[in-house]
UniProtKB/Swiss-Prot annotation:
UniProt site (Transition state stabilizer): H112, D115
List of glycosylated residues: N172, N285, N423, N536
Keyword Hydrolase in record: yes
Membrane topology per record: Lipid-anchor; GPI-anchor
Protein name listed in UniProt: Protein 5NUC
Propeptide residue range(s): 556-580
Function as written in the Swiss-Prot or TrEMBL entry: Degradation of external UDP-glucose to uridine monophosphate and glucose-1-phosphate, which can then be used by the cell.
Binding, Zn(2+) 2: D79, N111, H212, H235
GO cellular-component term (any): plasma membrane
EC supergroup of this enzyme: hydrolase
Matches recorded under InterPro entries: 5'-Nucleotdase_C, 5'-Nucleotdase_C_sf, 5'-Nucleotdase_CS, 5_nucleotidase/apyrase, Calcineurin-like_PHP_ApaH, Metallo-depent_PP-like
GO molecular function: 5'-nucleotidase activity; metal ion binding; nucleotide binding; UDP-sugar diphosphatase activity
Tissue expression remark: Gut, ovaries and salivary glands.
């Protein structure tokens, strides 16, 4: 076996080799510093040195590591697009300028890089000087991108050792974003194929995969591809950390696993998986030693909190200053005031009711009620629905002095989705609610993004039941009534609803194929604009939790099952019929 390894790895060093891998993922447009909770860094917070992150601090960490004499690699695992006023106003060109300034050794494409279609990716691919890699991304059927096909990998050299950096992007991009005719193939298959080619044809000794598919998929890559010794991942915003904590947290963040996750394989082979949370708050930092066979023998390191102890690089500040006036025209306008924290934390909004989700959905329902409605109806639709993954940030009333700005709202809703009207039956609506909780698992690495946020609906779930049979009870607002009230959802009855365009078009794997396109009406009303107007008209904001979503505990679930009786049997029959 050792002889075969030497034949596979020509030019292998006679001694162990050590390199420091710095990495980020899911920066989501946070080019300048933010608060520890991810909200905008106000002037007061900046003066008090309470803010973290930003590309200028990233650059300082990379420069300091290189100056120490270490063999440094700096990688990014995708999703620079979306999530901030900077991207909202400036788009892809600011991303290209930022990555050129940071000078990653390689970066992968995330699913959000495709949010503005094929055309939205062109500026990054044409203006970036950073190698963008993707072995499972096929542009051949997409005319706009065909000439810009990324290479599957790039080879860099450190201390005479050749290192292969192979990129990949989640196959789910097809329904998570708007990639047009771009195809995404199996990550592990293409990584193994490229790894074997790199060793055979280019004499590469160390193989690192960098990409955007999430921790569960990254673990699978480690298990299926023995050539890979390190996977630098993204997509799931997972905070891996093994250092000291205060009350189980680091800067307010609860670690979701060790850093790195170690996958032990046969014959003393192991593979490491790392991820760096999201929004550029930390810099992933791992030092790895490989032996003569290109296998990991030891490692050390932790994500570095990019706080005030790390100075901001002047060139990074100067880069942002060139665009600050353009951004500021939209950035600072005050929309409303809030008396409460508007909680958009993904570990709450994707797992349970959250008050920011309630506010957004109430704004949508109010907008629809303001439009002309059928005779005898007080509103145009009975309910509105969206996916919890569309809530991208909180609004912290303490750090902002209670003022909500245009920037704050764009940080929450950066995607520019619209509301789409349609008629659905109660059974079809229940099917959408079931899809929202079919992967619900509070213990998982990945809080699923598809939990249904709603206004005009009150839903009770029992997660102990089998997927697609978890809706215990649902009530919906009456529309042909002078005093709005919640009534039991009737599965055979037709209802008029509005849904966010993202899920209507298949986002988060929602299926609206039961509605013909000609029977859908896209209102054209954009989510962030609706919410800003609603906030302005209802200021000061005091949105609370109101019980519109309930997850039963085990004893409650038993009682609920006893009380459902014949309506429950009807529900079962309709669900079976719907899924045939």
């Amino acid at each position: 076996g050792r002889l075969l390894a030497c034949l596979l790895l020509p030019g292998l060093a006679a001694t162990d080799f050590t390199a420091t891998v710095l990495h980020t993922n899911d920066v989501h447009g946070r080019f300048e510093q933010i608060t520890a909770s991810g909200t905008r860094c106000t002037k007061q917070a900046a003066e008090a040195q309470q803010c973290v992150g930003g590309i200028a601090r990233q650059k300082t960490v990379v420069s300091q590591a290189a100056a120490s004499g270490a063999n440094v690699l700096f990688l990014n695992a995708g999703d620079y697009y979306q999530g901030s006023i900077w991207y909202y106003v400036l788009g892809a060109p600011i991303v290209a300028e930022a990555v050129n300034y940071l000078a990653h050794d390689a970066m992968a494409l995330g699913n959000h890089e495709f949010d503005r279609g094929a055309e939205g990716l062109v500026p990054l691919l044409t203006e970036s000087r950073v190698p963008i890699v993707g072995c499972n991304v096929d542009f051949s059927e997409e005319p706009t991108l065909k000439p810009l096909q990324p290479k599957p990998s790039v080879v860099v050299e450190r201390a005479g050792i050749k290192i292969g950096l192979i990129g990949y992007t989640t196959m789910n991009t097809t329904y998570l974003s708007s990639p047009g005719k771009v195809r995404f193939t199996d990550e592990a298959e293409c990584i193994q194929r490229e790894a074997q080619r790199l060793r055979r044809e280019e004499g590469v000794q160390v193989i690192i995969a960098v990409g955007h598919s999430g921790v569960p998929r990254d673990l699978e890559i480690c298990e299926r591809v023995p050539e890979v010794s390190l996977v630098v991942g993204g997509h799931t915003h997972t905070f891996l950390y093994s250092g000291p904590t205060e009350n189980g947290r680091v800067s307010g963040d609860k670690p979701q696993g060790p850093y790195p996750i170690v996958v032990d394989r046969a014959a003393d082979s192991r593979c490491l998986v790392v991820q760096d949370f999201y929004m550029g708050k930390y810099m992933g930092n791992i030092s790895i030693t490989w032996n003569q066979r290109g296998e990991v023998v030891r490692w050390s390191g932790q994500p570095v909190l990019l706080d005030r102890s790390i100075p901001e690089d002047p060139d990074g500040i100067a880069l942002l200053d060139r665009y600050r006036d353009r951004v500021a025209q939209s950035q600072a306008s005050v929309v409303a005031e809030s008396k409460v924290l508007l909680d958009g934390d993904k570990n709450r909004c994707r797992l349970d009711e959250c008050n920011l989700g309630n506010l957004v959905m109430d704004a949508f329902l109010k907008k629809m009620a303001s439009l002309p409605s059928p005779q005898a109806s007080w509103t145009r639709v009975a309910a509105v629905i969206a996916n919890a993954g569309g809530i991208r940030a909180s609004i912290d009333e303490q750090s902002t002095g209670g003022r909500i700005t245009f920037e704050d709202v764009v940080n929450v809703l950066p995607f520019g989705n619209t509301l789409v009207e349609m008629n659905v039956t109660g059974a079809q609506l229940k099917g959408l609610l079931e899809h929202g909780v079919h992967r619900h698992d509070v213990k998982g690495y990945v809080p699923p993004a598809e939990l249904v946020l709603a206004a005009g609906l009150r839903v009770v779930y029992d997660i102990q039941r089998e997927p697609y049979d978890r809706v215990v009870e649902a009530h919906i607002l009456c529309t042909e009534c002078r005093v709005p009230r919640y009534e039991p959802l009737e599965y055979a009855r037709q209802y008029r609803i509005a849904a966010l365009s993202y899920i209507v078009h298949g986002g988060d794997n929602f299926d609206f194929s039961f509605v013909k396109p000609k029977d859908m009406y896209d209102t054209g009303f954009q989510d962030a604009e609706i919410v800003m107007k609603y906030m302005n008209s209802t200021s000061p904001i005091t949105t609370a939790l109101d019980g519109r979503v309930t997850f039963l505990k085990t004893n409650q679930a038993s009682d609920a099952c006893l009380n459902l009786a014949s309506p429950f049997l009807v529900l079962l029959v309709l669900v079976v019929f719907y899924h045939l």
